């Protein structure tokens, strides 16, 4: 429960300054449905500043092994189950799990039985097209 509260608090703190000018509402569930329609994953930017990015992500089957050399990621699993592999070490993923992926660590995600959604808190401004393949 503390992890959920921590993740929600972190999201609130990060999102607060980005939305200070005006309120915005995202229907994340509706936006992320593309992960079941011929796309392996959908990455929806929620907040983007020069210092950090917050994305909602839906994964249909897997995110192949890759790494980020420009900053760390913290994932909060919202729905679905699967396994993350960080430097050849498996980590079970299910709703409520918070996973820290340090800068430069090779990682992948394999979804089990459907689709997984998570919130990705990124230490830097993030472009998903710039991930380095292993």
What would you call each of these model-derived segments?
Residues 59, 70-84:
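Short, conserved beta-strand element in jelly-roll/cupin
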Residues 62, 81-83, 90, 106, ...:
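Structural motif
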Residues 89-103:
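Short acidic-glycine-tyrosine-enriched beta hairpin
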Residues 103-129:
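Ligand-binding loop in jelly-roll beta-barrel domains
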Residues 9-17:
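Hydrophobic core
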Residues 53-69:
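Conserved short histidine dyad/triad with adjacent acidic residue
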Residues 3-4, 16-56, 130-134:
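A short, N-terminal "cap"/entry segment at the start of jelly-roll beta-barrel domains
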Residues 46, 64-69, 110-111:
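Short histidine-centered beta-strand/loop micro-motifs
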